[in-house]
Amino acid sequence: MAIKAYKKEMSQIINLLKEDNVNLRSIKKLLKEFYKNEFNFNSKYYQGKTLLHYVIENNCETIIPMVINYGCNPNICDDSYMTPLHMAVTKGNINAVKMLIKKGADVNMGGEFEQTPLHLAVICGNLKITKLLINFGADVQLVDEKNLSVLDYAKDEKNNIIIEYLRKKFNIQKGEE
């Protein structure tokens, strides 16, 4: 597929995703057409984002399974080293987080500064997403490039609810961390 045609097709979908009243029927129809024409769903557009990044960015989580089933890899990073899962976590979109994980997103993948989705959930103070990621195998012992763990970030953010959850869940005594 020619680059100009690809950019035109991506622009079409991105513009539809950005509409206030997103017409999911139109988007799904267009995605099916692109799939039939062997559109590369892993191609990157502006700032290195794939179609899946734009789906997350515009809160259209209902089409996540379709985009992934058509071949979009949920573990591709954009130019800011964010996967769609990192984006969904920072947006606090728990439904998107669930769908991405169920469709193969890596819960332990390091992004910018080697921060995992769990690091970001803790930094954002989102206990529900923190619990969800841990239940799906997120490793609480992974550290970022500053050698900081999720517990370190919970302490930095003074998030006592997440600190207590982590201590109880992993039987960590005060002073042991």
Predicted regions and their residues:
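Intrinsically disordered, low-complexity regulatory segments in ankyrin-centric signaling systems
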Residues: 1-58, 65, 69, 174-177
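Leucine-rich solenoid repeat scaffolds
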Residues: 140-173
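Ankyrin repeat A-helix N-terminal signature
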Residues: 18-23, 54-60, 87-93, 120-126, ...
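Ankyrin repeat structural motif
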Residues: 23-33, 60-68, 93-101, 126-134, ...
